[in-house]
Every structure is written in structure tokens, then in C-alpha cells.
């Protein structure tokens, strides 16, 4: 069997590494570089990848694709995609399934299909170095990638001819690269990963015990639409706006000019990491009736920092939240690892150092650490690297919608993966023959406030009173963070499952907003949950009371029956409202009005010589009421 290579599939640049003896080695590509631009160009005769594609971008802007990772697993209508449409020189289009695809020379291409070209280049680079075929890989993704984005990355690997043995989170890979072989007994590190298109922060504990190293992710967070591209776009907008003020010409309408400005903006940003100012000179950038126009602009480091300071500040806010989730204080962090090319910016380094009160490590290559870590994980899977245990986490809570529109969480965020969790639910109606399992992801109590990942039906449930059938719902997250959900009728053994494949996955802004909303609305969520619990109790008591009235028959006087039915009707009316206290008061009223019912039941029991029945319960022990839709045949 050949080696398992490690690939950092980046937004801006990609990198490939492999275990060489007991160390991971980054492999140079055909151009002699250790990283490859994640750029793909389609010409009349061939497909170019990497530096050759980048060199011809100015003359072929509409067919030169970059930052495709920002589109992977996203819907066309999403805010992030709509924002990118305005600034990308190539055409982003809506696929038949609603995904964001790219139109190249009249053909619609899916992001995994395009990303596969970069992976093919990485595969060929490794094969040239090793002198043998490569078929297996570990590929890294941002820690905050959702299920759809992870699956799309696996699809890209398949298209490239690779068996993706593991998807590993980028900060975790960087921690592996940093900590492998360390003799320190116990250390907690923060990995701040600001790449070309994504941002991640992970708090990771590295333990050494009896010769075995354990890398345990305590918490993770980030933004899958924040990175160097966004920094570049701020500079691009500034250059274009300044030129428009001077010449009254908007370069955004000229794809070739826009590509030249993009290259100049990226170059200026990089130069300002070591210089205090730089000149942007683009002669013959465009022309009008008066003749050719030239662009000349001086940009200072201070100006650049003013343009992007809010982006850096937002990353620090994510850092605070993840530290809180990890249950760690700033003083408990032993080392800070900076990963991703954008961390070379002095402002980023300064703000991170100010937050932690110490400088980040300088001995970790931000462009190569992730690929090295992926290669180490490949070595672990292959058995070449021993005594290393990696414990990663899922970034968001997972659950299903239950009675009253509540999200019942089965797996909490920052749970170590792989993991499996089951819970028993039941039906909400008598003789319900089918249920719909609605799978959710998020941190809010109200189901509608979370992200829907998909739904499926479990049919063929035997007719039974509500609350009697036992439906076991199981969530299973594998080591790649990919989700499987199943539902099983414990009475009949019938089972249905779904592998969550909806490409309308969570956006970074939705994820962050969910967490922020959950914190800001904790009190509102608590009150909502209490009202729902009261409603569910009211519903159960109303159902049980009506059943007892029917069973009592003529043994119950007309006056008592009317009194009880009136109390039940008032309870049902109260349950439609938002007043928990009123619902509870009406529950007490029904219980009081139902005393004659208990007397009738006791009399019947005594006549039959049986035991006195206990008051009916709205719930069976260990069974959670769940409101499922009944699936009806349309015949």
C-alpha cells in the first residue's frame, strides 16, 4: 500500500506533505514552490492550475477561477455568495439544485469539481516526489465547516481520484504539526488560523502520558467567510473608489481592469507587512474618449490598517467566545500558534499579542503547518506514527424538533467526535402511523430559530394511543464530522435513516448569529421553553381527562360532565396563549373539576375488586413527547 498524503486545500494557496521517516515533509511542486496558488484557468486548449493559471489571469479574467473554497457547499441565494458575485470577475450562477456554481465558457461547474483540479495537482506533485501512485489522502477543512461543506470536500477528493481517509480541522492539524514529539507534560495552546478565505480559532490541550500524546480540542469557533480575500477586497474597493473620484470611471465594470487591481491590491497588502508605504502603479488601466487612463496611488500601512481593523476586531471577538467555551482564561494558554498567510500582517500579530499578553510562536510556518499536520494524521492512520491520539469536536449542537416547536438537543456543541447519541421520543396523536424527523443544527430553544439540515419519514407505526409508541432517534457523527441520523420504532423494529447531504448548509454568519442570539436571548429562550412545557402538560391532561369522561359514561352526572368539559375547554384556550401562570392555573382547575371522575373510577375499581387506579400521567417515563407530522397517502 502507498502512503497517505496530507493536503491543505486552501482558499488562496494549497500545500501537500507526506511522512518521510518519522517527520513530515512538504513537497515542492513542478514550479519548485512549496505552496501552489488555488487558482484554476480554463483556456481554449487546456486547464491550468497554480502559478501558470495565475500568470494569465489578467488576460483571461472570466475563465480564471480563484477562492472557490468560499463557494463550496453554499447556496446561490446565500448572503456570502451574493456578496462575492459583485466582486468576482468570473460568473457565479445558480445550479438546478440551488447551489452556487460557476459558469465557464457556457458550462456550469460545481465547486467540488473545480477544487478537484487543485487536488489533482497536489496528487501529481506527491506522485512525482514519491515515484509511485497515490490514492489516499487526509484533507483539511476549516473547523467551522458545516456538514455540506465537509461532504463537498470529500466529493472533490473523489473527483480527483483520491480516497479521502479523513477530513481533519485545520487548527487541529496545525496543533499536530506543532506538538508532535514535544516532551512537555501538559500544555494548552490556542491556534489562530486566518487564511485566505476562512478564520478558525481552536483551544487544544496536548497531554503526554506514558509515552502517548493526546491532542484534545476543548472548543472551536470561527467564520468560514473571513480571510485574506476580505482584506484584499477592502484594498480593492479603496483603490477603485479613489480612481473613480479622480477620473469618474468605475473599474468594477471592466473585468480585465478589475483583475489587474486585484493583483495590485494583494501585492500592496503583502508589501505593507514589511514597509510603511507602497505605490500602486497601473498604467493604461482603462480609457475613455479623452484617451488612456493611468492609476497611481500611494497606500500607507496606517491606511491599510484603518481599512481592515474591524475584520481583525471580529476575529478577536470569536477568540473571546471560544476561550469561554473551553473554560480557559488567557493566563492558562501556554502557546499561541498563528496559521494562515494573513497572520503575517503586523496588525493581526499585534492584536493577538495584546489579547493574550504574550507574543505568538514564531517557529511555526503559517503556510505549511496545516499540511504537515494532515500528513502526520495520515501517518497515524497508516500506522507509521504511533502513540498519538487526536480528539476533535463538533462546532454546533444537533437535535430534532419536538412538541411545541422546541429543539431537543441530542449532541451539544464542542462534543468530542466521533460520537453517537440516542433518545426515545413518542407520538403526539392517537393512532399516528408515521412521523417526520426534522433534523436541526444550532443553539436556540425555538426550532424555527435554528438551521434545518433535512427531514425524513418513519412510516408503518402500529396504531396505538399517543405516547405509547417508542421512537428511538440516533445521531451518529463520524470522525470527519459528517452526520447520520436514524429513527427506529422499537415495537416493530422498522428503521429509517438519513445521511445529511443538504448543500444548503450553515453559513458562518448564521452560526455566529445563532450563538450570539442564544446568549443574548437566554432569558427569552428559558421563558419560551417553560411555556412550551406548560402547554405540553396541558395538552396531556386535556387528552387524558376527555378519555376518562368517555370511559365513565353514564356513571358521571350531566352537571359534573359539563363542569369538567368547560374546565378542559378553558385550559385548551389558555394553552394557545403565552401566559405560563394562566395555563398552570387552568391545569389546577381541571384537576379540581375532575374529582368526580376519580370517584367514579374508584367506585368501578371497588366493584370489580381491583386496585384503585392512579391518576393518568400525560407522559410515559423516559419518553419525551414529540410533535411529528402525520404522513398521509395522497391516493
From Swiss-Prot:
Coiled coil: none
Disulfide bonds: none
Pfam families listed in its UniProt record: HSP70
Induction: By stress conditions e.g. heat shock.
Disordered as annotated region, ranges: 602-635
Recorded superkingdom: Bacteria
Low complexity biased stretches: 602-617
SUPFAM superfamilies in the record: Actin-like ATPase domain, Heat shock protein 70kD (HSP70), C-terminal subdomain, Heat shock protein 70kD (HSP70), peptide-binding domain
Keywords, in A-Z order: ATP-binding, Chaperone, Nucleotide-binding, Phosphoprotein, Stress response
Tagged with keyword Phosphoprotein: yes
The keyword Chaperone is assigned to this record: yes
An example molecular function term from Gene Ontology annotations: ATP-dependent protein folding chaperone
Phosphothreonine carried by residues: 198
HAMAP family in the cross-refs: DnaK
Record function comment: Acts as a chaperone.
Family, as annotated: Belongs to the heat shock protein 70 family.
Protein name, UniProt field: Chaperone protein DnaK
